[in-house]
A protein has these predicted regions:
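Extreme N-terminal starter segment of soluble prokaryotic enzymes
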Residues: 1-4
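C-terminal auxiliary extensions adjacent to catalytic cores
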Residues: 346-365
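Histidine-centered metal-chelating micro-motifs
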Residues: 152, 172-174, 193-196, 274-275
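Conserved mid-domain beta->alpha element of the FAD-binding
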Residues: 8-33, 145-146, 173, 245-334
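Residues in the short beta-alpha loop(s) of Rossmann-like NAD(P)-binding domains
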Residues: 32-34, 41, 65
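Conserved FAD/dinucleotide-binding core of flavoprotein oxidoreductases
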Residues: 82-105, 137-139, 178-249
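Conserved N-terminal helical subregion
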Residues: 20, 45-159, 163-176, 214-226, ...
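Short phosphate-binding/catalytic loops that engage adenosine nucleotides
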Residues: 24, 57, 234
Length: 365
């Protein structure tokens, strides 16, 4: 049986690995000239690590990762609004780790047969019968996995009437800085702006920020980050001072409205192509890894793609909704609303977070 994977990101490589382990002949088509990722930091929650274990990649990924430390939410002045009970989270759900996105991709790419990886190939169309049109010609497969991101060519080809990605209302910046002492990990919430930082395994710091802006507004790079956040609490000014202007990544944030199905004929969608979500729960990559495991399971069991759709669509769309709601509250800009939000966070027990995360993290391969 032959499978073509459209897209060589996390969803694509994980799907290729899952299918290869089930005996499929796999080909991954990636439009970039090489299978690499500039990217930044990435959180892998316990559900993702269970998925990686099921793919046989858990150990090499954890060898390149660092366990998530104490964390919480602050205001722009540095006052704690809430702290995560990471000990209880780990006891209840398992370990969470931080890794550089490029390191995760490297592990996945190494685990897939190298002859299966075809870079520099741009897919221009996909048909439900398993035909893939691309810059190198035309290919046919028993299964096509559209893992080509939020603006998926696969989705637009097979589901031309599917809803377009929806702008979340805020934009994002990401940058990895040289090592800077940061103490506890935190995400700080202001008025329509947020800034977070997390140590990576090599001592560098992954920083991310969001701000309410019109869709398509210029990002402004490091200068804009400094303008917005240089007056926030330590160590944010030091992190911005240490950042390389050329390393700042800027992207508007989108989510995909719920699709009626993730499958059609011999085609299945995975990752952001199926359920692009805002990053507020840190679940985008985690859900892509779950997709891959389930895809491998249902094809091995001979249950057909309907079982994949049944197992994945409701769960991923639930997580997309939860992530949207968290982001909406985090991006509140009205002074009265921000005061109310911050007061509520201070009063909320850490056990409430554990309960809220249970439907997301309680997943078994």
């Amino acid at each position: 049986m032959k499978a073509i994977i459209v897209g060589g990101g996390i969803a694509g490589l994980a799907s290729a690995l899952a299918l290869t382990r089930r005996g499929w002949q796999v080909q991954v088509l990636e439009r970039a000239p090489e299978f690499a990722e500039a990217g930044a930091g990435l959180s892998l929650w316990p559900n993702a690590l269970r998925a990686l274990d099921a793919l046989g990649a858990g150990q090499p990924v954890c060898a390149r990762a660092v366990p998530a430390g104490q964390a919480g939410i602050r205001d722009a002045a540095g006052r704690w609004l809430s702290r995560d009970d990471t000990t209880e989270l780990a006891r209840r759900f398992g370990l969470a780790v931080m890794i550089h996105r490029a390191d995760l991709l490297a592990v996945l790419a190494t685990a897939v047969p190298q002859e299966a990886l075809r870079s520099g190939v741009t897919v221009t169309g996909v048909r439900p019968d398993g035909t893939v049109l691309h810059s190198a010609g035309e290919s046919r497969a028993d299964l096509v996995v559209g893992a080509d991101g939020v603006h998926s060519v696969t989705r637009r080809s097979v589901w031309p009437d599917a809803p377009a990605p929806r702008y979340a209302g805020y934009t994002s910046w990401r940058v990895v800085t040289p090592p800077v002492p940061v103490g506890e990990t935190s995400e700080s919430w202001g008025r329509g702006e947020r800034f977070g930082y997390v140590p990576l395994p090599d001592g560098r710091i992954y920083c991310y920020a969001t701000a309410n802006t019109p869709e398509g507004a210029p990002g402004g790079g490091l200068a804009e980050l400094r303008r917005r956040f240089a007056g926030w609490h330590d160590p944010i000014p030091a992190l911005l001072d240490a950042a390389d202007p050329g390393a700042v990544l800027h992207h508007d944030l989108y989510e995909l409205p719920p699709l009626r199905t993730y499958i059609s004929g011999n085609v299945a969608l995975a990752g952001d192509a199926a359920h692009a979500m805002t990053p507020n729960l840190g679940q985008g990559a985690c859900q892509a890894l779950e997709d891959a495991v389930v895809l491998g399971d249902v094809t091995a069991a001979g249950n057909g793609l309907a079982a994949y759709d049944q197992r994945r669509r409701g769960r991923t769309q639930m997580i997309t909704r939860r992530s949207r709601r968290i982001g909406a509250v985090g991006q509140w800009a009205s002074p009265a609303a921000v005061t109310l939000r911050n007061t509520a966070l201070r009063l909320l027990p850490s056990s409430a977070l554990t309960r809220a995360l249970a439907p997301v993290l309680d997943w078994a391969a």
